[in-house]
Amino acid sequence: MKVLVTGAGGMVGSHMVELLYDRGDDVIGIWHKNKKNIEQIAKPIKFTQCDLRYGYGIDDIIMENMPEQIYHLAAQSYPTVSWVSPAETIDVNINGQVAVYEAIKKARKYKDSSYDPMVVVACSSAEYGQTLNELDDPYVLETAELKPLHPYGVSKVGQDLLAFQYFMNDHIRCIRARIFNSTGTRKVNDVTSDFTKRAVEAEKTGVYELRCGNLETRRAIMDQRDLVHALMLLADKGKAGDVYNISSEHIYQMEDIVKMIEKAIGHELKRNIDPALIRPTDERIIVGNVEKLKADTGWKQEISMEQTISDMLEYWRNH
């Protein structure tokens, strides 16, 4: 099968192209700004640089390859950046997606009117926003109201609804995947990534201290391999036009993460609480109800947090 992955330079995208290649697919990966993750891939996967906002680039890629599945992962994906650069966030996330869909329409018009790819759009738990603070049950359903609290969340609502309207009006099959917290190798700037990287630095220096924030915070975190597996299952088995949560069902306190790291490295870490790492207010536990995902695809979370941490430690030892 010919498959296109946008955002192939990101954590999820770079792992996805490898897993699709291992499955036997003919994979094309699109990257834009950062090649670091792609340079770590030894497999003979085709990569091309493209800024999706300029439609002629993605037009040519889709017209030439006519992929049967498209995983649209490319995005400005940091909420904090969206506060500083709201216009760019909206531009990249909304207009980039419009360009992908318009390229599909052009391929139908000029090359094959029966062209019928499945488009899996990476949406976000950030779409729920304030609703997460109002619900009694932390396990949020796909039917919950969308009340985003930052420009990034707004842009993801836009992507979500754009996919739906192209499905309804142009009959372009899609899956809208609302993705919750994930981590893994090649991830940067999240708690698990920061802690494992600092632990490896402690191994190298012999100073077993860990700079950290509020260790009582709790998060539902899944391994990026479980996330990629869910996305691949949805492309094959999900109901076209529908929306699905992808979330860990396991909740971890940050102190538990530190203890897992200590066990993995065989050494205790002195906790150095840095006030700069403590948020003035912290969000509630964010967990997605994944019963719909499991019912329609058979997905289940398979990779333990202990395994994720072990793999991340090994990654930082070698990079």
List each language-model region with its residue ranges:
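N-terminal Rossmann NAD(P)H-binding glycine-rich loop of SDR-like oxidoreductase domains
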Residues: 3-22
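Conserved glycine-rich Rossmann-like NAD(P)H-binding loop of the short-chain dehydrogenase/reductase
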Residues: 25-35
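Rossmann-fold cofactor-recognition segment
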Residues: 42-54
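NAD(P)H-binding glycine-rich loop region in Rossmannoid oxidoreductase-like domains
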Residues: 52-92
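Catalytic helix-loop patch of NAD(P)-dependent Rossmann-fold dehydrogenases
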Residues: 84, 91-102, 112-118, 125-176, ...
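NAD(P)-dependent short-chain dehydrogenase/reductase
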Residues: 131-138, 161-220, 224-233, 251, ...
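C-terminal "lid/loop" region of Rossmann-like NAD(P)-dependent oxidoreductases
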Residues: 210-214, 241-244, 253-259, 266-285, ...
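Amphipathic terminal alpha-helices
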Residues: 305-319
